[in-house]
């Protein structure tokens, strides 16, 4: 998001035969269940893979808070390269951006957004920034420093609803109109502190959950 790294700089494997060179067999597919008794991983489509030892490294996915309007156009997580592309298109200088969440990863995201020259508001439901890692004093210092950089921060605050509205001249709509592109309607974001904010982009940085649904009833202790 800052622009210091091109997309190809995010690739961990630089050659097509990366796995082969390490004597690793690559199989593309979705794991459906794990049969612990017979030591097999069953894939969607019927194929099974036998194992002696099983490493579970299936990653995680962003949490989608149960907020009305969370699936509206213009609301994005910041998790994948595709997410970053979508955010780059909307987070133009002067764009009004609201970020939900001010944890460790959220602070990295907000720093990148601030460097892009957006009008940024951060909403954190905890009583301080980075609530799971910082004491109240340290979290307050971070909040004060972020505010000194021109970012609006609301702690002890939740997003209650997100509502698309008719375009009212947001910077993203203006830019899109000039270049003949399609635009995303502005969004009204209702907060628990009584404020309602109109923005061009909402970023959800409210945590992640592990991709382990396929392990249900497998006998593996999570």
Where do the model's predicted regions map?
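Residue-level detector of alpha-helix initiation sites
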Residues: 60-62, 82, 104, 129, ...
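A general structural signal for well-ordered alpha-helical segments in protein cores
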Residues: 64, 84, 106, 139-143
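Glycine/serine-rich phosphate-binding loop and adjoining beta1-alpha1 elements at the start
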Residues: 44-89
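Nucleotide donor/acceptor-binding cores
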Residues: 53, 73, 94-96, 118, ...
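Rossmann-like NAD(P)H-binding beta-loop-alpha module
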Residues: 86-134
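Glycine-rich flavin
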Residues: 1-24, 61-64, 83
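Conserved phosphate-binding and hydrolysis motifs of nucleotide-dependent enzymes
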Residues: 52, 59, 101-106, 194
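A Rossmann-like FAD-binding core segment of flavoenzymes
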Residues: 26-34, 38-42, 49, 115-222
């Amino acid at each position: 998001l800052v622009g210091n790294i091109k997309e190809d700089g995010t690739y961990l494997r630089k050659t097509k035969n990366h796995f082969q060179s390490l004597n690793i067999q690559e199989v593309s597919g979705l794991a459906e269940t794990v049969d612990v008794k017979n030591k097999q991983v069953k894939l969607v489509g019927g194929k099974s893979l036998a194992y002696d030892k099983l490493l579970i490294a299936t990653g995680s996915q962003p949490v989608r808070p149960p907020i009305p309007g969370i699936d509206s156009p213009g609301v994005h997580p910041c998790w994948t390269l595709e997410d970053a592309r979508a955010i780059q298109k909307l987070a133009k200088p002067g764009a009004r951006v609201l970020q939900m969440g001010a944890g460790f990863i959220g602070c990295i995201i907000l720093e990148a957004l601030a460097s892009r020259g957006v009008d940024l508001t951060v909403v954190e439901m905890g009583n301080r920034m980075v609530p799971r890692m910082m004491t109240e004093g340290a979290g307050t210092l971070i909040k004060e420093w972020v505010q000194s950089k021109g970012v609006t921060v609301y702690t002890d605050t939740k997003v209650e609803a997100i509502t698309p509205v008719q375009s009212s001249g947001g910077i993203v709509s203006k830019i899109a109109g000039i270049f003949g592109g399609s635009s995303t309607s502005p969004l009204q974001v209702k907060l628990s502190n009584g404020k309602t904010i109109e923005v061009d982009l909402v970023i959800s940085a409210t945590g992640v959950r592990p991709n382990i649904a396929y392990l249900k009833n497998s006998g593996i202790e999570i």
